[in-house]
Amino acid sequence: GVGFKAGVKDYKLTYYTPDYETLDTDILAAFRVTPQPGVPAEEAGAAVAAESSTGTWTTVWTDGLTSLDRYKGRCYHIEPVAGEDNQYIVYVAYPLDLFEEGSVTNMFTSIVGNVFGFKALRALRLEDLRIPPAYSKTFQGPPHGIQVERDKLNKYGRPLLGCTTKPKLGLSAKNYGRAVYECLRGGLDFTKDDENVNSQPFMRWRDRFLFCAEAIYKAQAXTGEIKGHYLNATAGTCEEMIKRAAFASELGVPIVMHDYLTGGFTANTSLSHYCRNHGLLLHIHRAMHAVIDRQKNHGIHFRVLAKALRLSGGDHIHSGTVVGKLEGERDITLGFVDLLRDDYIEKDRSRGIYFTQFWVSLPGVLPVASGGIHVWHMPALTEIFGDDSVLQFGGGTLGHPWGNAPGAVANRVALEACVQARNEGQDLAREGNEIIRKASKWSPELAAACEVWKEIKFVFEAMDTL
């Protein structure tokens, strides 16, 4: 007879190992698992470990040619989710040897590959990953990081200000450049290509790059400050993307941009390496993230996509605004903001952080708050995000009744007022509106902005709860 026992496997015999002591080199994953009715938690957890590592549905004779114990993923802990009747957090440990060095693509193909279509599960969500130093050290990470960016731009002690150029599609390159110039001249640090501006018939990329570079140099000459515009280098092929980044580099501008999820991790990592080699900062937009992270029970939480970006490389990444939303969501957002910026982040389940993460001097990423914010939000944003952030006001700049430059002035005055008030010991949360009102007395631009966006409040339920 054959020398192995053929037949369909009972996963939990091999892959459920509650006594396993995790190694410092293991990649650890926390999955939110919703099994099909009648599937026990241990079997579901073991199935996740198996399907995302070495397992297949039946015993194969080639199993005998390798050491499964060395290479298999292990489900080492299961805990029920409070308030849900059939949902579990399943912890899986993966041996480091399963992953190619320096490849986010390969890491995700294994951990969030076929397993998400597995029939025994109703739903599956990857909540968090612990990336061990042994693996993170195989990545270059962000092209420059927070400190180098501040030194390049000569801007310290405050958040940076940005603005997305609108209308996002339809402007000619020259008019687009005019809009950029007005914003930068008024006091913003950056303007931004919208994520869907690539190279369309009404505005080809090379024309846009040229007119935006002209706007940058003109605004720098006028203000004596270093300016930037996130030139979106995202393209249909990696070769074309690098060509666009190279043109930006030739123009001498400080920063380019990439849509990292639609562009893909392989393209993003290539661009990130190019940016470090050529002294370009890299701004990352997360278009498509909600397709992956919005459902509570299925998909991948954004904190994992954020960690993946820090490995793949980017100097800025969009990370939500928090403002006016519920407290729980604030804690969770600040959790992944810390994962982006800090070197060492303690496990803290109240902030959605399932594992202690130690990046070991991998450069940090600036979180970008963007979307629906205006001058009245400035005190809250300054308090929540602190100095190491980029605050982006698209409509909150361009919607100013007097035009782009006064809109930029209003935002800069509001920001400087908030930073000064904070440094003098005022409580931004309590006295925010008063600080803005006081500043608007000597800035007609800010006063006009305050009038347009009277103290608006957002009233939606939090999507992202624990």
UniProtKB/Swiss-Prot annotation:
The keyword Lyase applies. The lineage of its organism: Eukaryota, Viridiplantae, Streptophyta, Embryophyta, Tracheophyta. Binds 1 Mg(2+) ion per subunit. Mg(2+) binds at K192, D194, E195. Its EC number is 4.1.1.39. The disulfide bond which can form in the large chain dimeric partners within the hexadecamer appears to be associated with oxidative stress and protein turnover. This is Ribulose bisphosphate carboxylase large chain. It is an enzyme of class 4 (lyase). GO terms for cellular component: chloroplast.
